[in-house]
């Protein structure tokens, strides 16, 4: 989503609160909880889940391994839920032609660097760069090339933009910033 006027362009960036992350977190939580309950029921020799009789699963080694997988899955699931609740990666890109400043803001993980803010002068922007990698895992990423600082990604690598969409976005941004476009 973006908002544009004659002098200001604000591009909102979606973070980790995506439907796919919610789905993976739920699937991982339920699956790992099932593994952990089966491991515990094999240890207690009692049916905690009625689908699998605990007599069929011996605690050592199957129940122990399933308990380990369940705990590992719960840790990964809790990590996913934390990134979703903190909305890591969300933010905005603000291009202000009137003041000649570009602000790139992102939310990070809690701590000292929770708020990530880059302020750049528009005169330091060399170009808008499109990086295209075709093949099985095709990806197209839009970068802003800065003098002395390298390239700053403006789109996420998991955004599946079509070639037409990425070209249009790059052309509009390059026209707004009055810089050339490079394709790699």
Swiss-Prot record:
Its main location: plastid. GO terms for cellular component: chloroplast thylakoid membrane; photosystem I. The keyword Secreted does not apply. The chain crosses the membrane at residues 22-42, 57-77. It is found in: Plastid, Chloroplast thylakoid membrane. GO terms for biological process: photosynthesis. It is a multi-pass membrane protein. It holds the Pfam family Ycf4. The keyword Plastid applies. Keywords: Chloroplast, Membrane, Photosynthesis, Plastid, Thylakoid, Transmembrane, Transmembrane helix. Seems to be required for the assembly of the photosystem I complex. Belongs to the Ycf4 family. This is Photosystem I assembly protein Ycf4. It comes from Populus alba (White poplar).
